[in-house]
A protein has these predicted regions:
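A structural boundary/capping signal
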Residues: 1-153
């Protein structure tokens, strides 16, 4: 466990509340802008809010994962052992044809974030990339070496 993780545990930071408050602050600041196709703007704002609140988050771009389609979102690690993460994507609704039919990512659609594991990660990537040949681990995406918050492959 690194020093940052220790400091989070000592401070008993409620990641769920910080993420929710960060999304609310971003929505207030960007009031009037459409979320569709604004993934970079929204993700960057939420990422900066999370950083201000000392939450270890990764700004992920699908291009950096080796995919042709570009989309940006955030991962926040909840627990290394269980490999659970929060996925934050305020623009996910653009990938859903019929919101009433969406059963898996209802929290993501309603709250802007959702707790996921590797199985849900694969499903999420398949939904946004419209590709069934997705072979990517959520741990690999989160733990890639980064410079200036960008992933280095």
């Amino acid at each position: 466990m690194n020093l940052f993780e220790l400091s989070q545990n000592i401070g008993k930071i409620n990641q769920n509340k910080v993420i929710s408050d960060s999304i609310k602050n971003v929505n207030d600041e960007l009031n009037g802008l459409t979320k569709d196709r604004m993934c970079k703007v929204y993700s960057s704002y939420v990422y900066n809010e999370l950083k201000k609140n000392h939450i270890l988050a990764r700004l992920i771009n699908t291009n950096d994962l080796g995919f042709d389609y570009e989309h940006q979102f955030i991962l926040v690690q909840i627990n290394k052992l269980t490999k659970d993460y929060y996925l934050i994507d305020l623009t996910y609704s653009q990938f859903i044809k019929n919101i009433e039919d969406e059963k898996v990512f209802t929290e993501l659609l309603n709250k802007g974030y959702q707790k996921i594991n590797n199985e849900l990660w694969i499903q999420y990537l398949k939904n946004i990339l419209r590709n069934n040949n997705v072979n990517s681990s959520i741990d690999e995406a989160f733990n890639k070496e980064i410079n200036n918050n960008r992933i280095n492959l």
